[in-house]
Amino acid sequence: MSRKGPRAEVCADCSAPDPGWASISRGVLVCDECCSVHRSLGRHISIVKHLRHSAWPPTLLQMVHTLASNGANSIWEHSLLDPAQVQSGRRKANPQDKVHPIKSEFIRAKYQMLAFVHKLPCRDDDGVTAKDLSKQLHSSVRTGNLETCLRLLSLGAQANFFHPEKGTTPLHVAAKAGQTLQAELLVVYGADPGSPDVNGRTPIDYARQAGHHELAERLVECQYELTDRLAFYLCGRKPDHKNGHYIIPQMADSLDLSELAKAAKKKLQALSNRLFEELAMDVYDEVDRRENDAVWLATQNHSTLVTERSAVPFLPVNPEYSATRNQGRQKLARFNAREFATLIIDILSEAKRRQQGKSLSSPTDNLELSLRSQSDLDDQHDYDSVASDEDTDQEPLRSTGATRSNRARSMDSSDLSDGAVTLQEYLELKKALATSEAKVQQLMKVNSSLSDELRRLQREIHKLQAENLQLRQPPGPVPTPPLPSERAEHTPMAPGGSTHRRDRQAFSMYEPGSALKPFGGPPGDELTTRLQPFHSTELEDDAIYSVHVPAGLYRIRKGVSASAVPFTPSSPLLSCSQEGSRHTSKLSRHGSGADSDYENTQSGDPLLGLEGKRFLELGKEEDFHPELESLDGDLDPGLPSTEDVILKTEQVTKNIQELLRAAQEFKHDSFVPCSEKIHLAVTEMASLFPKRPALEPVRSSLRLLNASAYRLQSECRKTVPPEPGAPVDFQLLTQQVIQCAYDIAKAAKQLVTITTREKKQ
């Protein structure tokens, strides 16, 4: 289906006349030269289709023309309309400019970097901003203003946003209001037509109840867009979604199956739902690339544009995906037509089996479904050997010269609605499942709330136990601060002397011989036996013991000062290692005045370890509470799956890379939101592991991971000075931030290594 605009259009990127391509996700029309750059960016940046030679749903084409005619291009070129930008030398590309590097650099800056999009004045909290934008989108889709919704989506609004008060998504609102074009735009940006509302009703149900039957049918097509597109690529047909949702072609010579093909099919069936969905989406993107390649070669007519630089030989890299997945996506281009068709048939069959809930069948039951090994396949071109004599009027688009009609007749379509389950029963079951899932989510939220309340009560109990034990102790003499003459005894006798007074303690801070251990610490823990709990008025909400050092009391070498260092018994400062006990015991035995023995500490005897110094620095900002609980009780030997740990590690690494880019670009105002994202990713990764892991390497790695994440937050908050105009040493701060990020990455790598090793054993 094709349609031209009512007026002469120009390319949105270089103003060339009569553009032949459309960017669906950007709502603009582009010429052939600019389209070659769009295709090289990938579908995650720009989804392109030819206006005349590609198959278009009528409402989708109408949506693109509406956006293009209403000035959607001004969204992506907002700052270029400012006269100040013209004076600075930044300009739009011209039709006479070369594709590389002028047009390509401009298009990348425009769509990939979003260099010309209007920026919001305040982006301190991206989460709150995205939520507000999504709520605006939720309200705007009931109207017919497409440009406003596209602008909100470009600023970060979520198409699948679930409104907490109204219990619906934007697609529910658009379907109820009958806004077909708004629904098309939302689906392009990832809205799910099958997502239930708070009552389990989908946007399709909303459209039908409101009497918008054509919109409901279109939403059903969007729900099965992936399988419909794969089937249409093979045989040129789509299911009508009334008698069935799947058309599964089969190879005419599929009875000749090898053992390798049967084994490959079993591997496909053994994939988890998430991995199978990722594979299906990657094959969908490869189908789109091959169809656009066919259109490109057919329309260029071997002109100068058909060059290596304008071709897209494989799927471009998507930075949101892992390196392994990107490599697998690119290897799909190496499949010849026969291999690729066999893979598509297997995916269609497996998708149908999974959605209908059928059990796995033996390979002999479905001889037409297989995955071919590349070494066992011949070099036949497409499906010429099984082409039919029937002719169609479709125009040739394949580079091999074979027509889509021949390919359609070379396949036998399977039944559209086999199986004992009727469509009505399936829809009822799906609705009941959606309702059950909504109830499960609600119960999970209630459970989480109760768990938080239980943890709070446990902290209160520990606090009361500590106060009770303190009140039961016999009263002792209250130590008084020493006189200045007495404090003088703590200073060295000579400035250059190397003799240190090691037999004195800090005044009124530590009570020697105290054996109070409410947490059941190890008997040999020297530091715990030297701590006395403060009065209840000095206790923090989440900490029972703290080493309270008055400001300026100790001056540690290299300018590190300790003001308040709260910790729990599970923190690294309370470990039973001799090194940590020796270093910490020195802290309790030294200095009582402004001039303490720390100023003369020998270089060969470090006062605190590196980890201890980091905890002291962290204590200057806020209390630190490690995520690991006390190790009282049974230890849990269980470990999460290696796949889950690697997935969370990639998320942590991605957020760290974003932070490092901000540091390289001197965007210090981005430190705080980046650190929040890293902390969230670290929390999700730590939640994979048991509360009391049995392996000591796992416990130490988790402590380092959580401690570094908290310290990173503390360091990043220093970018905002406590008083306006106060100087901030950004160079030193950046070094501290990079060090924290390194510690987080190191701990995450250790957890991946440990998990992989333990799973192999």
Swiss-Prot record:
- Which keywords belong to this entry? ANK repeat, Cell junction, Cell projection, Coiled coil, Cytoplasm, Cytoskeleton, GTPase activation, Metal-binding, Phosphoprotein, Repeat, Synapse, Zinc, Zinc-finger
Instruction: Identify the stretch(es) annotated as Interaction with ARHGEF7.
Output: 254-367
What are the start and end residues of every segment in region (Interaction with PTK2/FAK1)? Answer: 253-415
**Span of domain Arf-GAP:** 1-124
What happens to this protein after translation, modification-wise?
Phosphorylated by PAK1. Phosphorylation on tyrosine residues may be catalyzed by PTK2/FAK1 and SRC in growing fibroblasts. Phosphorylation at Tyr-383 is induced by activation of Ephrin-B1/EFNB1 and catalyzed by SRC family kinases. It is required for the interaction with NCK2 and for GIT1 recruitment to synapses in hippocampal neurons.
Top-level division of the source organism's lineage: Eukaryota
UniProt zinc finger (C4-type) residues: 11-34
Which residues fall in a compositionally biased region of kind Pro residues? 474-484
The region called Interaction with PCLO is annotated at 245-365
What does the entry say induces or represses the expression of this protein? Up-regulated at the transcriptional level by MYC.
List where Polar residues composition bias occurs.
357-374
Q: Does the keyword Repeat apply?
A: yes
Sorted alphabetically, which CDD domains does this protein's record hold? ArfGap_GIT1
Spell out the residue ranges making up region: Required for localization at synapses.
366-587
Does the keyword Cytoplasm feature in the UniProt annotation? yes
The role this protein plays is: GTPase-activating protein for ADP ribosylation factor family members, including ARF1. Multidomain scaffold protein that interacts with numerous proteins and therefore participates in many cellular functions, including receptor internalization, focal adhesion remodeling, and signaling by both G protein-coupled receptors and tyrosine kinase receptors. Through PAK1 activation, positively regulates microtubule nucleation during interphase. Plays a role in the regulation of cytokinesis; for this function, may act in a pathway also involving ENTR1 and PTPN13.
User: What is recorded about the domains?
Assistant: The coiled coil region mediates dimerization.
Protein name per the record: ARF GTPase-activating protein GIT1
- What would be the name of the gene that encodes this protein? GIT1
